[in-house]
Design a protein with these regions (language model features):
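Glycine-rich phosphate-binding loops of nucleotide-dependent enzymes
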Residues: 1-273
Length: 273
């Protein structure tokens, strides 16, 4: 299904609290943008969810399964798929080989079959077809035999989305997906995210600084500031929030108290996993 929930998720580094008891529930069929000023704790929150960092306190659940004590790779197998700000690819392999490896990682039982030449050939042919199907979806078949190192930055990010698709996650996590892209490259990635969003069985989380991208893609926005969840709601409502303006601009409008009601009911939900 892709129901992701964090409960009182916290990260402390010495005396610094990078993420402070953040509780959120993310539902399938929605794209949630996680925004906030630099140092707000957005990427740290992502790291806690995906298992790149251990939580000091709190829990992470996906479809009722607790992920808190699992490694990053185990969380990937459970259904969390994360793209990084820096591409995480094999530069000396071809585009097709990269995707085929990702497809192979999701295949269950292939490695348990007898090691005869026929089964090896069948597995290879099947994986290749699946990888080619994914490359067709992201319009990269013409680059299938190119090495990753030869691709421009925008195409490498595009390939990273293809790798995520190969893993068949129920939750997609994008951390600054258009970072470092030109004005011509960024729309390609955004179109891929739109395609993923059209699948109402998937849950999408997006960390993004570009507010025009957030306004266009997000069904919901949560705002972190100094590691705390300060606003959670629909884009228009959150954008107009005095709490959000204070977090970004450092100015405390008179209306800030009235805006505190923007914190989502999700954060205060009494529903247990």
């Amino acid at each position: 299904m892709g129901v992701l929930q964090t409960q009182d998720l916290t990260a402390r580094f010495g005396g610094h609290v990078a993420v402070n008891a953040v509780s959120c529930r993310f539902e399938p069929g929605t794209l949630t943008a996680i925004v906030g000023p630099n140092g707000a704790g957005k990427t740290t929150y992502f790291n806690l969810i995906s298992g790149q960092l251990p939580a000091t306190e709190g829990r992470v659940h996906l479809d009722g399964q607790e992920l808190t004590g699992l490694s990053a790779s185990a969380r990937t197998r459970a259904g969390l798929g994360r793209a990084f700000q820096l591409t995480n690819l094999f530069p000396n392999l071809t585009v097709l080989e990269n995707v085929r490896l990702a497809v192979q990682a999701t295949e269950e039982g292939a490695h348990l079959r007898g090691l005869n030449l026929w089964s090896i050939w069948q597995d290879h042919a099947k994986l290749t077809r699946q990888a080619q199907d994914i490359l067709q979806q992201v319009s990269m078949m013409t680059q299938a035999n190119a090495t990753v190192a030869s691709l421009p930055h925008g195409d490498q990010r595009k390939l990273e989305v293809a790798l995520l698709m190969a893993l068949k996650p129920s939750v997609y996590m994008f951390d600054e997906p258009t970072a470092g892209m030109s004005q011509d490259e960024a729309p390609v990635i955004l179109n891929l995210i739109r395609q993923l969003k059209s699948d109402k069985t998937k849950t999408i989380l997006l960390v993004e600084h570009k507010m025009d991208v957030v306004r266009e893609l997000a069904d919901r926005i949560i705002v972190l500031h100094n590691g705390q969840l300060v606003a959670d709601g629909e884009p228009a409502e959150v954008m107009a929030s005095a709490v959000v303006q204070e977090a970004y601009l450092g100015v405390k409008p008179e209306a800030v108290v009235a805006s505190e009601g923007l914190k989502s009911k999700v954060m205060h939900s009494e529903e247990d996993v």
